[in-house]
Amino acid sequence: MAARPRKNNVSVPNLYPLYSRKVNKVYWRYKHPVTGKFHALGTNEAEAIAIATEANTRLAEQRTRQILAISDRIATSKGKAITTSTWLDRYQAIQDDRLKSGDIRLNTYKQKAKPVSLLRERAGMKLISAVDVRDIAQLLDEYIAAGRPRMAQVVRSVLIDVFKEAQHYGEVPPGYNPALATKQPRRKITRQRLSLEEWKKIFDIADATHRYMGNAMLLALVTGQRLGDISRMKFSDIWDDHLHVIQEKTGSKIAIPLSLRLNAINWSLRDVVARCRDYAVSAYLVHFFRSTSQAERGAQVKANTLTMNFSKARDLARIDWGEGSPATFHEQRSLSERLYKEQGLDTQKLLGHKTQQQTDRYHDDRGKGWSKVAL
């Protein structure tokens, strides 16, 4: 005679086995701890354990939020501090409103999600006024140790803003900002700058392969704009003899005269725009000249396609980049700034930077140039 199946071989709370003599099987049920109702989970023990464990976790989180909410209401009424988790809920709501009103860009909004989630995970149960420098420093150290200093910079920047907002709403004392007290993570930039000679080599290969690549590279060098903005440029953006650009990253509005000429390559913006006009009807300056398996004739060339084809042409040019990583499409923006600076142009306005310090970063050739001794 077969042995009777064990009925109580699991220790997951609220999970119960029900043995059926009729079919000689064990059915699993989950008992809701609040309503007392049973929910059938079938005969698969592993699945039943997983479902019950997940249900218990969610109920525990729900209870924790309810307890925190009650605790925070009491604390607020008594003028005491609230928990970090509750403040982060309010901070998220503030960011939602800022996004809707246009105060921040979508990319900025998305960038805040991970750092907020990390702080909630590590210090959500602590009072917001009890989060200290060590809590933040430990978060940053993990990214630095993993070789991700750029992400550490992002986390620090967002958490500085979290505590700035907390100050504005009186949830922490004035000046209280443990994130600001942490050391700024340093990131060594290994990507090489692009020289004009290197640009010409890449341009010749890229233009011969895809004419739209030649157009995109000329626009990048003559206008100094970012990759995404170049991809989105339309003929309808041209009026009053200017090309109008609303920068995707910052929202800056720039009107570039068609008469602007980059002397180093002897191309004006008007010349480049004329080159972009061809037999393919398109709303975009950078567009496909013929239909392909992935795009129709006249369709916009997306930023990813420009990046990929630039990299291919760059590799075919067989340029020695030394110990650094090869230049990317974006490096044309720095080259443009340096060439226009030699012409005496106000490159800060052209690039759409709020401060001269931002522009100066682009002017740094990262060791490519030579310092000449004046006699």
Curated annotation (Swiss-Prot):
Protein name per its UniProtKB record: Prophage integrase IntE
What domain of life does the UniProt record list for this protein's source? Answer: Bacteria
Residue ranges of every copy of the Core-binding (CB) domain listed in the record? 82-167
Show the active-site residues: 226, 249, 330, 333, 353, 362 (o-(3'-phospho-dna)-tyrosine intermediate)
What are the UniProt keywords, alphabetically? DNA integration, DNA recombination, DNA-binding, Viral genome integration, Virus entry into host cell
- Extract the ranges annotated as region (Disordered): 350-375
> Tell me, what is an example of a GO biological process annotation in this record?
DNA recombination
The encoding gene = intE
- Span of the signal peptide: none
Ranges where the Tyr recombinase domain occurs: 189-375
